[in-house]
């Protein structure tokens, strides 16, 4: 199953990293630096310092790409 997690903060990043253990997971974040760090370093130091993310987790700043990718969307954004 292809999963997209919408949100690049604490909740979105934690859920995305956990889901990536079993599914093709793409995380959407607004901040291009957060996206770069997730993709290149497997970290999100702005929200989860000291925590290594799953190596298969990918991120994008392109909202449409995240939605097109998904069989399942998970919202991890503040309400």
Question: In which residue ranges do the predicted regions lie?
Answer:
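NAD(P)+-binding Rossmann beta1-loop-alpha1 motif at the extreme N-terminus of oxidoreductases
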Residues: 1-49, 58-61
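Rossmann-like NAD(P)-binding element
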Residues: 51-79
């Amino acid at each position: 199953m292809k999963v997209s997690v919408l949100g690049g903060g604490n909740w979105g990043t934690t859920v995305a990293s956990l889901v990536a253990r079993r599914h093709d997971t793409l995380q959407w974040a607004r901040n291009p630096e957060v996206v770069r760090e997730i993709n290149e370093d497997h970290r999100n130091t702005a929200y989860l310092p000291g925590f290594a993310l799953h190596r298969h987790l990918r991120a994008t700043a392109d909202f449409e790409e995240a939605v097109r990718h998904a069989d399942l969307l998970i919202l991890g954004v503040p309400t």
